[in-house]
């Protein structure tokens, strides 16, 4: 994997490309555990980074499939569906500026969110029934894990 990678017109962070290259020979399986059970903002976080997508084809395939999995259905995509959880983001219904880069052990997605900044995406995670911002950057995100 090169140190520059663009998916759907969005350039992924160089630090992500370096980590993906490190685990490319393992098909992206990294099984990184949290150092502490908290996200970059101090909120509780219980997950691990099981796999990162280490090739462009897989990144594009998984990213393009997000629109098929997260469809407004009367609950998901409704304006007030997650208003009770202060850590949750509004349901995403337009994934043009989202790139899925990995999964936790339970299959929940880790994604880059380029909606607010095209140069430094935040990291969001699908937590059971809502999206949640867990880091301001990939560099912050990867510092949450041991052996990265």
Segments the model singles out, each with a brief description of its role:
Residues 102-104, 115, 126:
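Structured loops at beta-to-helix junctions and adjacent beta-edge loops in soluble globular domains
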Residues 119-121:
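A short alpha->loop->secondary-structure connector
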Residues 124-148:
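Compact, glycine/acidic-enriched structural inserts
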Residues 26, 114, 145-146:
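Alpha-helix boundary/interfacial micro-motifs
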Residues 1-108:
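A surface-exposed partner-binding patch
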